[in-house]
Amino acid sequence: LATDGDADRIGLFDSKGNFIDSHHIILLLIHYLVKYKNQTGKVVTAFSTTEKISKLCKHYGLEQSTTKIGFKYITGYILNEDVLLGGEESGGIAIKGHIPERDGIWMGLIIWEFMAKTGKTLEELIQEVYDIVGAFKYDRNDLHITEELKQGVLAKCKEGISAFGDYSVLRSEDLDGFKYHFENDQWLLIRASGTEPVLRVYAESKDQESVNKLLKTATETVLNF
């Protein structure tokens, strides 16, 4: 179990030393709270989190809402609605019955409880989730570019993009940044950071090789607008 300096964000490592990101942790928590603890409620996640959350919520009949990036938007839901879990890509997660804010230590304890009660390894529990939503990989590139180039990329995104190299856009969203959906459940998000002078490019696909290819193609495309 790993947290950041003030312990509001969480990361995990499995028995082989592989890093388990926040997307997988969110999925594990939903799976545990619903299947094993019979809890209910809405799931609220930020725009940059995995699309697999929607699949898991649909599987369990849970309502889901997507917010702009920033935990304050998730907290608003927690304070006003019956929220089972709220989570963001950076590792901040909150669950029902605790505080309406991120707590990495508490999330770690819940995961350990999950492992202890089932007698299963983290890898085995993740496989349970994969059996429902399918395996996936997620990654992000932070592009340190000039403000002029960054604004140029965002302007091009606003105009509309139909393809990134060989990846044809099926549909797009602009809740917070610009998200592009492709075939085979692949997607890409381009967003200017709200805390650093960078342009972030997020991607999700079936495996790491596919994610790397999508990120490479997207990065080359935006840098040549």
Each model region followed by its residue ranges:
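Phosphate-binding and adjacent anionic-ligand microenvironments
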Residues: Y36-F225
